Amino acid sequence: MPVPRILDSIVVGGQTFTLMTRISGELLIDKFDALSDAQLDTIIQDVFAVLRSLWTLRQSTQDSGKVMLSASGHGLPSPAQMFEELEGPYDSILECYFHMACHLVDSEAELRQLYPAASEALLTDAIVYVHADLRSHNILVKDGRLSGIIDWENSGWLPRHWQLHVMRRSCSSTR
């Protein structure tokens, strides 16, 4: 997989830093207009292949079914808190959504009652490993191909549809 390899984790002045390998390439956001449609199609297919590979990873038995769960077992930055605070992990997808919508409903049961179709769709979605900031400023390209994906700090176990939320187009191009 085209991701940096972790070399070490160190604490300096009370802050933790992760040292990792460098991946060659340029940010997709900076090369977007210079790439042909065929090259962009290839890069999209390359990224999708990485996603499919991530989706084959399985949670550990003790964490099975949990969401908003980082690789280290902690919560993840919450979109309900403008990504400023960690939330989770939650024991289920529905519990996660209840906490994000707690100002709208009083319980998970009420959430299910008010939105049965949405609740069913949420409950049947797969829990997969998601890159929580997979946009063009974190995709590296070289010679018209994907060369790497960076900024994995907020990735973790989330519903598969979550990946759609984070893959918004952030290019300024007219293409």
Each PLM stretch: what is its role?
Residues M1-Q81:
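ATP-binding pocket architecture of kinase catalytic cores
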Residues P2, D37, A109-Q113, V130-H131:
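Short amphipathic alpha-helical surface micro-motifs
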Residues M20, L134-R135:
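Structured catalytic/translocation cores of nucleotide/phosphate-coupled proteins
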Residues Q39-D46, E110, A126, R175:
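Soluble or luminal CAZymes and related metallo-dependent hydrolases
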Residues V50, W55-S60, S64-S119, V128, ...:
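Active-site catalytic-loop/activation-segment of kinase and kinase-like phosphoryl-transfer enzymes
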